[in-house]
């Protein structure tokens, strides 16, 4: 790929002069608070994260981009590292995408990283694994400030027993019975690589790692359930 012609920023507006060049493929790592969205994918019944990202790209480059994603989160679901990709003819420097898109995105969506990747990279089909995290606030009284981010359950939960039982899911299995509206995939076989259930004394939802596990496995009000697989069927994790 040839050297890109420079893109210049207006000192007053900060807008880029997106001079055209050969087609480029841009991979974005996006974090968002899904509280105000009906999901990632474009839908007619409310705002979606995909629309917010595509509008920001249009304002930046003047192009109508179709943004692909590694996963399609549902209504109210958040993401720490959603991977997305789109193609563009813009010559904007790669770091300019991250900075400028964040200016055009709403406050609850942010591009954490932007990288130019080969044209055959596809955010959906190039994904090799996905990680989902569910957080249960296991205490007598719920915290109203966490209502959009955790599920409150007041009765005692044996997280150690949950973790032990969940290990039966690890491995390559036919998860047909876990899927709703079957069949909507060519195969219902998936490989679950890891399932962990552990308690935490704190709830740093914005961190990629749950942090240190308490010395007492039954300590901590927050139960973190994480599952990693090569892919998931529709409603498979919820089941």
Task: For the regions a language model picked out, list residue spans one by one.
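Short linear segments in intrinsically disordered or otherwise low-structure-confidence regions
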Residues: 2-4, 8
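Structured-RNA-binding interfaces characteristic of tRNA pseudouridine synthases
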Residues: 14-239
């Amino acid at each position: 790929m040839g050297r890109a012609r420079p893109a210049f920023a207006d000192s007053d507006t900060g807008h880029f002069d997106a001079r055209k060049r050969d087609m480029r493929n841009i991979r974005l790592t996006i974090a968002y608070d899904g509280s105000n969205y009906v999901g990632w994918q474009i839908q007619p019944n409310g705002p979606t994260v995909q629309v917010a990202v595509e509008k920001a790209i249009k304002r930046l480059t003047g192009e109508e981009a179709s943004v692909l994603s590694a996963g399609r989160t549902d209504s109210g679901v958040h993401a720490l590292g959603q991977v997305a990709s789109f193609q563009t003819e813009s010559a904007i420097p790669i770091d300019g995408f991250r900075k400028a898109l964040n200016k055009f995105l709403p406050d609850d969506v942010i591009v954490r990283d932007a990288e130019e990747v080969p044209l055959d990279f596809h955010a959906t089909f190039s994904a090799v694994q996905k990680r989902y995290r569910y957080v249960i606030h296991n205490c007598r009284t719920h915290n109203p400030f966490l209502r959009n981010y955790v599920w409150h359950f007041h009765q005692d939960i044996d997280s150690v027993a949950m973790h032990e039982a969940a290990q039966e899911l690890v491995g390559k299995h036919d998860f047909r019975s876990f899927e709703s509206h079957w069949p909507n995939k060519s195969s219902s076989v998936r490989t679950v690589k890891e399932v962990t259930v552990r308690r935490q004394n704190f709830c740093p939802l914005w961190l990629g790692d749950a942090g240190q596990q308490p010395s007492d496995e039954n300590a901590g009000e927050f139960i973190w359930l994480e599952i990693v697989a090569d892919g998931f069927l529709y409603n498979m994790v919820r089941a």
